[in-house]
Amino acid sequence: MAIKLYPLGIQTFERIREEDKLYIDKTEYIYRMAHTNGKYFFLSRPRRFGKSLLVSTFKNYFEGKRNLFKGLAIENLEKEWTEYPVLHFDLSGGKHMEKDQLERYLGFILEMEEKKWGITQPQVDANNRLTELIYTAYEKTGKQVVVLIDEYDAPMLDVAHEQEQLDALRNIMRNFFSPLKFCEAKLRFVFLTGITKFSQVSIFSELNNITLISMDKDYAGICGITQEELLTQMQEDIDMLAQSQDMTREAVIAKLKEHYDGYHFAKVSPDVFNPYSLLNCFAEKEFGSYWFSSGTPTYLIHMLNKFEVLPNEIAPTEALESAFDAPTEKMKTITPLLYQSGYVTIKDYNKDTQLYTLDIPNKEIRVGLFDNLLPNYVDGKSAQQGGVTIAKMASLIRKQDMDGALQLLQDYFETIPYCHVTNHEGHYQQMLYIIFTLLTGFVLDVEVHTPRGRVDMVLLTQTDLYLIELKLNKSAQAAMRQMNLKNYHKRFVLCGKPITKVGINFDSTTGSIHDWIIEKA
């Protein structure tokens, strides 16, 4: 059975080690970063990816708490274990704040550190208080100071696209961070984490020598759980889950990969699992939607609508690094937000064109995202019922009963209120795309090119390939005639599976499927 309990909700390295909970060993990365030529480092990763635990690990390492690192990789790497003064600031508590509230919050976290260092009459301004802290810690210990700032961008994320509020909060944060530059001689190591890198904040505009490790291949596995770590450090956990699910070990690993794997943070990167979902899956013994359920993507859905991004345009997509590893407050496309928030990830890199292929990482994200997009096309009650319909459709399609699946879909569409009916063909195509995407276990592609045109949708199941052509206010026969006239099926004859053509015609007056035709190619 699994030896250690899972550190769910615990982000403190010291507590995890003292309570002997599961810790995935990241200390080789800690040693590597602490012994490079750099002094300033920044790491961005999506929420709940282990950034706070990483910061806590750095804190205990630089405080020289060697006993906490017994049995870990760094025990054999580090020879000196020098104790440094550490200033640790967690800005995650600074969310959803106005200017005055943020200033008071910064004062609060500064006061906690000032008490540790015996500062009873601090300066007034936040930047001067941080400067005084650095100098006091340096003078009292005779050693350079380590500064750790977790979630540096938390106060600004909520107002990233509200220019007036953003400017006000950004000025406060710029002022707070400014001592990190002119106190350089007193500093041993500075590490900041966040989700995005805001432009015009002093740590990026003034610290020209800051090392950005977010897309560095040497640190691609510093957060999250790599496939190698899963297979070497969590063997008992896999066996316990397999026993609980009555599955083979190999089948469990494959399902874990399907649901929670797929992240890559560099051109060359190990496969990285979402740590929050993976640990919750092992703890609950269920393949649930944990990461997605822990945060509603309301803001993302709003921005998708603002940028007029259609569901089938989200991913896959190609982009230069500068197009997605970029400040989100000035983004011209949705790509930086999708990437930095963890909804898409790197899947490939072309050296010749320097283009990255970005795609949705795994089943949990794909299902969660498209499930949240469905209410854009149907009302809330209909969207909830849609989940039931989609599950039943998937079962029928697995049994090669496409006719039964479309009958279910027709019945479902007829429950959607009239206010969601439109005479725009693209609306029905996108709605159908979302629904077919939610038919988990299948592969879906849209507007697939053939020598003589484009197929609206191609659905690949374990047993069949379906070519789907849509029409609005015409006839299913017209859709089938187009597929036959242009010989769409010949483009797929080498797929090795039976090909079925499906013509679907929508009626804009009812908002439902009027008729359909199914033929074997």
What annotation goes with each model-predicted range?
Residues 491, 495-521:
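Domain-level recognition of nuclease-like catalytic cores that cleave nucleotide substrates
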Residues 136-141, 435-463:
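Active-site metal-binding core of divalent-cation-utilizing nuclease and nuclease-like domains
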Residues 176-183, 336-344, 433-437, 482-502:
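Metal-dependent nuclease catalytic cores in nucleic-acid-processing enzymes
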